[in-house]
Each structure stands twice: as C-alpha cells, then as structure tokens.
C-alpha cells in the first residue's frame, strides 16, 4: 500500500494578488539624474533598500538601460511608481 505525501506548503509573501503575476516597477536610465540622486530616491521610497543597495540598482539601471526595482501587488506598485516619479526618476509604465 502506498501513501501519498502531503502537498508542499507554499509561503504567501504578499507579492502576488492571486489574479496573476506581480506588478513590476521599472526605472529607466536617463541623462539628467545622478547616481547619488537615483540611489537617494530608491532608498527613500523602497522598503529594505538602503543607499548602498540604491547605488547598486543605479549602476544596473545605467548599464542595462533599465532595472526592475520592486515587484508585488498592484496598489503598492502604483504608490512606489508615483513616489519615484515624484523624485524625478524616469519611469517605465508598470508591467505585469
């Protein structure tokens, strides 16, 4: 007689709405924001991003032309998008 293994438990990290994929906040490279300015904006708006992590993201944005800086639920993504745009960052439209 064989026994069925219990299903593996999935942790809910709050990154998805249950209705699809997470929403992505993307910052685009531009020629008017400094690395320090981008790092400051990212560290001021995004939870868990300090200035050093903001600098790493600024480098990724510069080298790749864009970077996903946060992903998660739509309402939170919209808030972060608005706040980063308010800091003068060049933003791509939200993507899912």
Q: Model regions: which residues?
A:
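Terminal domain-initiation and capping elements
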Residues: 1-96
């Amino acid at each position: 007689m064989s026994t069925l293994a219990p299903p593996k438990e999935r942790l809910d990290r709050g990154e998805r709405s249950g209705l699809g994929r997470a929403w992505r906040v993307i910052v685009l490279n531009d020629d008017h924001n400094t690395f320090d300015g981008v790092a400051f904006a990212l560290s001021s708006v995004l939870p868990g991003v300090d200035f050093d992590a903001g600098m790493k993201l600024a480098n990724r944005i510069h080298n790749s032309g864009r970077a996903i800086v946060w992903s998660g639920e739509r309402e939170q993504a919209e808030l972060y998008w608005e706040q980063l745009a308010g800091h003068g960052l060049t933003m791509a439209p939200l993507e899912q």
